[in-house]
């Protein structure tokens, strides 16, 4: 069976097709929302418009890589997180498109959330089938979250730590836009950071499993005002994020010793962040950027799981 996944976040319009028999992603496509120069994202009404305009074209593109007539179930992320009160209008575009597609074909529709899609994609990409049935710590680090989650697969999720103010992706994007890059700016910030050879001593404001990142933005602004190079400032920003995550994970492991840590979310696409954490944290799992940043792969996998067509993953 093939399953369809659609995710319409505040960053990108994403679609994916999953083959349950082969246990692999047949194809996926994504288009970032257009953001005007100097702006930090879109209003929800504008995001909803751009998703609605992009979906037919992307569905046509998806059809070039997969037989859409063979799809037996569909999934759509209907809201940001699986918690009461979680709502964002931009997700209406994707779940409505998924509902229309499934109704026209007479196939099941699975409603899930953006965060659960991220978790499923990360666990799948880590190629650890056992993760779906055991406890693990999962970081979801993006422009809208800096959440530390205690999970038993993508279904049972408990948020045990988060940022009390600014999210990691917001700090990164604000620095990138400040330097003249288009939003989202994470890739450019990471590129500049990787070019910096100067040593950096990162700082972190962490209390238990919660953190504060508003001071990071202020420090980056101060560095630029003092004449520090963009490369140094970007490296400082990303390493501070990485050190923050390391300390949050260390606090969580004191309460939940021995659990693996899986990283998901767009910020975790940065090689600078990954290298820092890999050198300092045992039993951690990072996934390729295709599965870390916003995508519909996890949604298509969750659709397969919910209709009883769970793939066989290599351990």
Set out the residue ranges of the language-model regions:
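Short beta-strand-loop/turn "lid" adjacent to the catalytic site in phosphate-handling enzymes
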Residues: 57-96
């Amino acid at each position: 069976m093939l399953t369809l996944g659609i995710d319409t976040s505040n960053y990108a319009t994403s679609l994916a097709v999953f083959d349950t028999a082969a246990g692999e992603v047949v194809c996926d496509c994504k288009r970032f929302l257009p953001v005007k120069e100097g702006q930090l994202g879109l209003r929800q009404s504008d995001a909803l418009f751009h998703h609605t305009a992009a979906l037919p074209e992307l569905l046509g593109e998806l059809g070039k890589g997969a037989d859409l007539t063979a799809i037996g179930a569909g999934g759509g992320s209907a809201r940001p997180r699986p918690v009461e009160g979680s709502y964002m209008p931009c997700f209406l575009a994707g779940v409505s498109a998924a509902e229309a597609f499934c109704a026209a074909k007479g196939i099941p529709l699975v409603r899930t959330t953006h965060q659960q899609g991220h978790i499923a994609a990360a666990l799948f990409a880590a190629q650890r089938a056992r993760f779906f049935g055991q406890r693990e710590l999962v970081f979801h680090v993006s422009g809208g979250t800096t959440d530390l989650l205690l999970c038993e697969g993508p279904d049972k999720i408990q948020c045990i730590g988060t940022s009390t103010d600014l999210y990691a992706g917001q700090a990164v994007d604000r620095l990138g836009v400040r330097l003249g890059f288009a939003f989202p700016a994470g890739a450019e910030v990471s590129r500049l950071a990787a070019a910096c050879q100067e040593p950096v001593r990162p700082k972190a404001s962490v209390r238990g499993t919660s953190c504060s990142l508003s001071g990071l933005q202020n420090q980056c602004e101060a560095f630029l005002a003092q004449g520090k190079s963009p490369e140094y400032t970007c490296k400082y920003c990303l390493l501070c994020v990485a050190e923050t995550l390391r300390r949050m994970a260390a606090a969580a492991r004191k309460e939940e010793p021995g659990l693996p840590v899986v990283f998901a979310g767009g910020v975790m696409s940065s090689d600078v962040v990954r290298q820092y954490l890999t050198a300092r944290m045992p039993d951690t799992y990072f996934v390729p950027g295709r599965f870390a940043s916003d995508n519909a792969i996890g949604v298509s996998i969750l659709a397969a799981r919910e209709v009883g067509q769970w793939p066989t993953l290599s351990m």
